[in-house]
């Protein structure tokens, strides 16, 4: 059975690429045609890539690999958090901070600081501090939760990075490649397929397209880990 059908992808608008003047020629192998100045992605090839991505991701999950979902643009942010949580993956959905991967020791210290502040807040320790000091600590807590909240279960570097928008997340791409971490990437017509190990050519701007692709990848991770794609707890990433 196909992981995703042509009709599902059509309904999600997965076939709409960017304006023809904004394309990357390396994506030509995945482009069906140009219509009204917009490239149309070949969904038959997308379906093949989705099948490959599903199998690859399921196999990686089965062997105990840890995943990081990355998508910081507005239309992807909520989906990234929901689907990552559903399959027990870590995620970044607000802003990629330089060194999230390449300066992991420092980033891990900031995550530990976040956990400490959360414990202080839940125990009432912050409320017991002088008003000004408590306000400073709460602002720090809010900032860390916003940018690092999705990484709290990540005790070490991920084995796989799943990307929504390759061009927007160029810093994440550079860091992952520097550390030889494989990338599973949604690729719009302005992307470079040579910069990822597992390409998924599709519209990376439409919410429904992002939901469809990330939903299937989360299913693959759950199936690889648990033998089914049902939702499980989010503690599988730790260890």
From Swiss-Prot:
One of its GO terms (biological process) is translation. Belongs to the universal ribosomal protein uS2 family. It comes from Synechococcus sp. (strain CC9902). It holds the Pfam family Ribosomal_S2. It comes from the Bacteria. The gene is rpsB. GO terms for cellular component: cytosolic small ribosomal subunit. The keyword Magnesium does not apply. This is Small ribosomal subunit protein uS2. GO terms for molecular function: structural constituent of ribosome. InterPro entries: Ribosomal_uS2, Ribosomal_uS2_bac/mit/plastid, Ribosomal_uS2_CS, Ribosomal_uS2_flav_dom_sf. Keywords: Ribonucleoprotein, Ribosomal protein.
């Amino acid at each position: 059975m196909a992981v995703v059908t042509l009709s599902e992808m059509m309904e999600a608008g997965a076939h709409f690429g960017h304006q023809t003047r904004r394309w990357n020629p390396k994506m030509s192998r995945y482009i069906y045609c140009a219509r009204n100045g917009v490239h149309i992605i070949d969904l038959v090839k997308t379906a093949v890539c989705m099948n490959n991505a599903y199998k690859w991701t399921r196999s990686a999950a089965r062997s105990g690999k840890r995943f990081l979902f990355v998508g910081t643009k507005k239309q992807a942010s909520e989906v990234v958090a929901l689907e990552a949580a559903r399959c027990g993956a870590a995620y970044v959905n607000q802003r990629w901070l330089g060194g999230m991967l390449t300066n992991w020791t420092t980033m891990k210290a900031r995550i530990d600081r976040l956990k400490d502040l959360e414990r202080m807040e839940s125990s009432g320790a912050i409320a017991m501090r002088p008003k000004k000091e408590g306000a400073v600590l709460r602002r720090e807590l809010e900032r860390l939760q916003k940018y690092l909240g999705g990484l709290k279960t990540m005790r070490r570097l991920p084995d796989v990075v799943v990307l929504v928008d390759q061009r927007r997340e160029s810093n994440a791409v550079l860091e992952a490649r520097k550390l030889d971490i494989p990338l599973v990437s949604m690729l719009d017509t302005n992307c470079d397929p040579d910069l990822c190990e597992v390409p998924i050519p599709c519209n990376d701007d439409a919410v429904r397209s992002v939901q469809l692709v990330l939903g299937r990848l989360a299913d693959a991770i759950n199936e690889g880990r648990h033998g089914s794609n049902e939702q499980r707890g989010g503690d599988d990433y730790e260890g």
